[in-house]
């Protein structure tokens, strides 16, 4: 079963992620608790999802950085968590518990039914595009033609995750790969073209989740102001990059002296924004070590509008492919990858195990807007006159970018830019 994520376009251009879960051979949900009319519980579970999503995002980020500390990072925690939650529909016993705990859900406070309800509500909320902001998220199952799925699983997959199902001939691996990749390509508006590179003929099912986001900056950068400038990879090493700029504006700003970093927020039109975190020289590791849900909350709560004389941000396009198996093992999701896996909620028999979880993300940041898997908006206004004491913010060294909705603590995309020229 595989799930593909559409891309999200953001103020700069950001693109999207696609995680996929491949299954090879090897708890009942309470309908009443999952009704769309359950508004009171909806607020509770939505907050629970956002909190777990942030915790999962930072835990995953730290593992990705450990593997490649000097590389760019780009991923959609929400896309990955949705794909794994989708998989958990068919999991039982230890396999189920490991997946949900790995996603950072507190199972003593939130039931399995509430977790799926929160994803159901999120999907309904996301799939509401407007002229200002295009945002959609989807799920799909690619199932071996001879595999018989339980009615309960297919019904829950459709009702909770809006999942489409496609009969797939995995014996013809080239055709199966094309079918899946074409689905992802269409869902991400062409941003993700080769999510699946290798497909075993023994594959029984592929789960795909996709998220697409497209938005414009409330205050776009003027292309005529973009110029070549230095981006410092270290104190003594730099590369020349196209540097965008804004002048004389008022934006949410916070100087975090405790963590030696500067935080600014740039808004998109619509309900989305991007947080940019700029550590002081040689302070990136200290900031990364303190990436916690409470840190993000403190940053967002501490933002105050401030007059900025000049803001410089590189124009860039980065993409990364990840095989998440080892990282998910580090996060406690182990049994699903072994012969002990209990995914009997899918077929009724314990004959499936996860062989691979792959994820691809693309982020494009440019003058007019962003295309990516998530977005949040922050208002930027021009000053009527030059300020006497000018604050200048230069993103000319490694920085972090987090794309968030303005009304929740969810994280749609998270990126670390160590080298804008490193595609």
UniProtKB/Swiss-Prot annotation:
Keyword entries, A-Z: Acute phase, Glycoprotein, Protease inhibitor, Secreted, Serine protease inhibitor, Signal
Region (RCL): 369-394
Expressing tissues: Plasma. Synthesized in the liver. Like the related alpha-1-antitrypsin, its concentration increases in the acute phase of inflammation or infection. Found in the amyloid plaques from the hippocampus of Alzheimer disease brains.
Site positions (Reactive bond): 383-384
Post-translational changes noted in the entry: N- and O-glycosylated.
Impact reported for residue 401 to V: Found in patients with occlusive-cerebrovascular disease; uncertain significance; Isehara-1
InterPro entries: Serpin_CS, Serpin_dom, Serpin_fam, Serpin_sf, Serpin_sf_1, Serpin_sf_2
Main location: secreted
Keyword Transferase recorded: no
Keyword Secreted: yes
Signal peptide from the UniProt entry: 1-23
Additional remark text: Alpha-1-antichymotrypsin can bind DNA.
Self-association state and partner proteins as the record states: Interacts with DNAJC1.
Purpose of the protein: Although its physiological function is unclear, it can inhibit neutrophil cathepsin G and mast cell chymase, both of which can convert angiotensin-1 to the active angiotensin-2.
Similarity section: Belongs to the serpin family.
Protein name per Swiss-Prot or TrEMBL: Alpha-1-antichymotrypsin
Taxonomic lineage: Eukaryota, Metazoa, Chordata, Craniata, Vertebrata
């Amino acid at each position: 079963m595989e799930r593909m994520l559409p891309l999200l376009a953001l103020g700069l251009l950001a693109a999207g992620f696609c995680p996929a879960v491949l299954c090879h051979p090897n708890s009942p949900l309470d309908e009443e608790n999952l009704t769309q009319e359950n508004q009171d519980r909806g607020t509770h579970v939505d907050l629970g999802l956002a909190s777990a999503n942030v915790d999962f995002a930072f835990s995953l980020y730290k593992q990705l950085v450990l593997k490649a500390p000097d590389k760019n990072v780009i991923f959609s925690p929400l896309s990955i968590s949705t794909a794994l939650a989708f998989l958990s529909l068919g999991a039982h016993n230890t396999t189920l518990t490991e997946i949900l705990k790995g996603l950072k859900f507190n199972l003593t406070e939130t039931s399995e039914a509430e977790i799926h309800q929160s994803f159901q509500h999120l999907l309904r909320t996301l799939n509401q595009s407007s002229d200002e902001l295009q945002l959609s998220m989807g799920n799909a199952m690619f199932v071996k033609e001879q595999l018989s799925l339980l009615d309960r699983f297919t019904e829950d997959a459709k009702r909770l995750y809006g999942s489409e199902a496609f009969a797939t001939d995995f014996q013809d691996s080239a055709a199966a790969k094309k079918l899946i990749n074409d689905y992802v390509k269409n869902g991400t508006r062409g941003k993700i073209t080769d999510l699946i590179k290798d497909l075993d003929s023994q594959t029984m099912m592929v789960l795909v989740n996709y998220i697409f986001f497209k938005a414009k900056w409330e205050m776009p950068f003027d292309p005529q102001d973009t110029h070549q400038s230095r981006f410092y990879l270290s104190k003594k090493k730099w590369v020349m990059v196209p540097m965008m700029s804004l002048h004389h504006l008022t934006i949410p700003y916070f100087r975090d002296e405790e963590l030696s970093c500067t935080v600014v927020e740039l808004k998109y039109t619509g309900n989305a924004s991007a947080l940019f975190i700029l550590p002081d020289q040689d302070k990136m590791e200290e900031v990364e070590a303190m990436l916690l849900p409470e840190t993000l909350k403190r940053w967002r709560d501490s933002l105050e509008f401030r007059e900025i004389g000049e803001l410089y941000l590189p124009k860039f396009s980065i993409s990364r492919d990840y095989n998440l198996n080892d990282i998910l093992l580090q996060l406690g999701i182990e049994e699903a990858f072994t012969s002990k896996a209990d995914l009997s909620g899918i077929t009724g028999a314990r004959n499936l195990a996860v062989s691979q979880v792959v994820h691809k993300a693309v982020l494009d940041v440019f003058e007019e807007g962003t295309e990516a898997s998530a977005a949040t908006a922050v208002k930027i206004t021009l000053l009527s006159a030059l300020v006497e004491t000018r604050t200048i913010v230069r993103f000319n060294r490694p920085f972090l970018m987090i794309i968030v909705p303005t009304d929740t603590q969810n994280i749609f995309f998270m990126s670390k830019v160590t080298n804008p020229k490193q595609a």
